[in-house]
């Protein structure tokens, strides 16, 4: 029995950077292959702000199998059934939004790990272990080792407790939720505001102090360059429906400008 590994987690653990796509709209059969063709190392499927359900997530994770791309899911919240089910259907990583305390972060880790380290219910020979048998203790160790756990810092409460959250064993990545954080701070969309700039610096410093990774969704070159300069190491690029819309708008504009 050999389980799939998680090269994104390995890259980050080795001090490298990881680049991928965050998918909000187009959960189509060809999407994972398109991401691979574009050079994405992971596909992060959003369940927080979309209608994505577990059956479709399971299909997307299956489509990623064998393509060399790591499937992950952002679940709606930190409840056990969201985290455990996302992993059971084949996600190799889970992002949890609006993590506010170290206790919540520890709860997330517990939901993702089997006893005695956690509380995840056991079901083997399913999607998450590629429908294989094998030595159960070895399988559990492999599943724990490959699972990437991401806590989003996007509230004043999360920012206030960011050092404690970063220090929780088993949390691998802190992902900056930039829009929600500015909303929570009372400065919606003010990404140049001194308080927001200081908040970002605090999140990155907490990651560096705890040996964790800071992550970010970049939508333009300016924000990407700024994040790289600050020390972020995990990136998703773009919002799929907006990228299609912008490309289509540009193409239609080009066509309308052509005259015989």
Language-model segments: residues:
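Expand to "…catalyze enediolate/carbanion chemistry for C-C bond making/breaking, isomerization
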Residues: 1-260
């Amino acid at each position: 029995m050999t389980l799939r590994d998680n090269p994104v987690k390995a890259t980050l653990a080795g001090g490298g950077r990881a680049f991928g796509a965050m998918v909000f709209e187009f959960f189509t059969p060809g999407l994972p292959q398109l991401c691979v063709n574009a050079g994405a190392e992971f596909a992060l499927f959003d369940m927080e702000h979309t209608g994505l359900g577990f059956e479709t997530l399971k299909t997307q994770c299956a489509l990623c199998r064998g393509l060399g791309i790591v499937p992950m899911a952002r679940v709606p919240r930190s409840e056990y059934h969201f985290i455990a089910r996302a992993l059971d259907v084949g996600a190799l990583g889970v992002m949890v939004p609006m993590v506010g305390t170290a206790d919540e972060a520890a709860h997330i880790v517990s939901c993702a790990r089997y006893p005695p380290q956690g509380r995840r219910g056991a079901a083997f020979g399913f999607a998450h272990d590629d429908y294989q048998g094998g030595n159960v203790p070895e399988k559990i160790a492999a599943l724990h080792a490959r699972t990437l756990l991401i806590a989003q810092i996007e509230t004043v409460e999360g920012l206030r407790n960011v050092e404690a959250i970063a220090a929780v064993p088993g949390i691998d990545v802190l992902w900056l939720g930039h829009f929600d954080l500015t909303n929570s701070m009372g400065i919606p969309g003010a990404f140049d505001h001194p308080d927001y700039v200081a908040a970002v610096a605090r999140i990155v410093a907490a990651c560096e102090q705890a040996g964790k990774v800071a992550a970010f969704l970049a939508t333009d070159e300016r924000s990407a360059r700024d994040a790289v300069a600050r020390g972020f190491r995990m990136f998703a690029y773009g919002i799929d429906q907006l990228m299609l819309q912008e490309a289509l708008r540009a193409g239609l504009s080009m066509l309308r400008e052509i005259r015989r």
